Amino acid sequence: MKVFDYEDVQLIPNKCIVNSRSECDTTVILGKHAFKMPIVPANMQTIINEPIAEFLAENGYFYIMHRFNGSTRIPFVKKMKERQWISSISVGVKKEEYLLIEELAKQGLTPDYITIDIAHGHSNSVIEMIQRIKTRLPETFVIAGNVGTPEAVRELENAGADATKVGIGPGKVCITKIKTGFGTGGWQLAALRWCAKAARKPIIADGGIRTHGDIAKSIRFGATMVMIGSLFAGHEESSGETKIENGVAYKEYFGSASEFQKGEKKNVEGKKIWIQHKGSLKDTLVEMQQDLQSSISYAGGRDLEAIRKVDYVIVKNSIFNGDTI
């Protein structure tokens, strides 16, 4: 198996057929809904909150609300349905999460999307949760993860998952590979390719995205949607503390398995960093879309499908050629 990561790959351009990149369509379909771009902010507490979720839903972007304020999920689903926006929440696999599914079913609330969100998604506990959701809320689109092997993808799909989330510890604030010796950190793009070849349903690439060009690379190697953490951290709208150092503003960004999220130093596989303030989330989304439109134009097409067909080269660690962004 070829092993490589985002910084090792460059996509090879095809003849451009559009007059302007603005003609290129970045729309993606996931389940019953179309979204403006194949990107989704990570379902982490310092990345997504209710106001951001509402902004994304209102403006045609996909989102997944995090699961760390458990009691707010049913009111959140109600609110989003009242506003006729998509409802998309996360669950774990503990007993209280089964009670949540039962309560949603009892109240006749069917979220459009539920993401089963645990670090090691290739497990009996995730399979059982998939089956419970599909039994009690059969119309809900279920995303399950996280996984890093074709066997895991097939098993979760066979259990009823509508999409799988691929990535074990490649994120900027994840230290799974250091703490455990396991993961897809350092070869996330190759793992995505490996898993996508086995998949019959959509794959969400999760982790390791450091530049906007990495979104196009994820699409090329089989992702339908790309989950992004660090590039969405540090915005005006982001949750988390702000600090000022030498006149420069920074915002905190921590992993879901960090002691800052857990509230205790137990089974820690995440850390906290400070991200320089980036301004408005809206501006970042516009720039991402423009860059992805450029990617489509370089691929020689008019929509995302063109990116899936381009050739590529593997040139280890040479993408920046000594430059920094």
UniProtKB/Swiss-Prot annotation:
Q: Which SUPFAM superfamilies match?
A: Inosine monophosphate dehydrogenase (IMPDH)
MF terms from GO for this chain are: GMP reductase activity
Q: What is its EC number?
A: 1.7.1.7
What GO terms in the biological process aspect are recorded for it?
Answer: purine nucleotide metabolic process
What is an example of a Pfam family matching this protein? IMPDH
This protein's record includes keyword NADP: yes
What this chain does, per the entry, is described as: Catalyzes the irreversible NADPH-dependent deamination of GMP to IMP. It functions in the conversion of nucleobase, nucleoside and nucleotide derivatives of G to A nucleotides, and in maintaining the intracellular balance of A and G nucleotides.
- Organism, by scientific name, is Helicobacter pylori (strain HPAG1)
Family, per entry: Belongs to the IMPDH/GMPR family. GuaC type 2 subfamily.
Active-site feature positions: C174
User: What GO cellular-component annotations does this UniProt entry give?
Assistant: cytosol; GMP reductase complex
Please state what the protein is called.
GMP reductase
Give the matching CDD domains.
IMPDH
What does it catalyze?
IMP + NH4(+) + NADP(+) = GMP + NADPH + 2 H(+)
Task: Supply the Gene3D superfamilies for this chain.
Answer: Aldolase class I
- The entry marks the following residues as binding NADP(+), namely 203-226
Keywords (alphabetical) are: NADP, Oxidoreductase
